[in-house]
Amino acid sequence: AGAEAGIDIDTTTTPYLNTIAPDMQGLYPGDLEMEKRLHTINRWNAMMMVTRANKYVDGIGGHISTYASASHLWEVGLNHFYRGKDGDGWGDHVYWQGHASPGIYARAWLEGRLSDENIHNFRQEIGGAGLSSYPHPRLMPDFWEYPSVSMGLGAMTAIHQARFNRYLHHRGLADTTLSRVWYTMGDGESDEPESLSELALAAREGLDNIVMTM
């Protein structure tokens, strides 16, 4: 009503500003052209995996656009940020957005960690060689580390993982100072009450060991 009456109302929306000045930015650490090429291949393969699955089993679904919309975040993270368990410290904890699992499968196939048979049986697990719809450590214990579906649970569990890492360090049980928790949240997922309810915990505990993007 105020806006309709011509009253100037402040908004929380601000123009995009790069927080790093151009003269302070370093060179990209990787082979940008090669990474772009691999990124394009992964994005295509993820879409084809879902399309093929629906061709043979009508209505099986698969969230064809989730990975495509946020794939830059995950690919740069995998190439340059996420730390595995074989490096210094305990490694990072990556909670994948569940609907983006086709993209993670596509990359794993490109790396030779999944077979053609696996890819051809996306969302068809009864035969024994299929791939689960979402990150599911019980169904695929050698592939997925953390569950992140139903929608909203990933954000909540990621925050509690970050808090638990801090607890382990403060109690002298494990040195988790180098470990980071990563979670990429979908825009629709942010409407789930579970997603937002634990943000107060992260703020109250001062958890600077978790990175969440939307």
Over which residues does each language-model region extend?
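RNase H-like, metal-dependent ribonuclease domains
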Residues: I20-G30
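Short internal beta-strands
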Residues: V94-Q97, I210-M214
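Core catalytic machinery and nucleic-acid-binding channels of phosphodiester-processing enzymes
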Residues: G62-T66
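Short glycine-centered, acidic/aromatic-flanked micro-motifs in structured strand/loop junctions
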Residues: I60, M185-G186, M214
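Terminal amphipathic helices with adjacent charged low-complexity linkers/tails
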Residues: A1-P22, G89, Q97
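Cofactor-binding active-site loop characterized by glycine-rich and histidine/acidic residues
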Residues: G30, M34-N42, A46-Y56, Y67-E205
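Short, intrinsically disordered, charge-balanced linker/junction segments flanking boundaries
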Residues: A1, G206, M212-M214
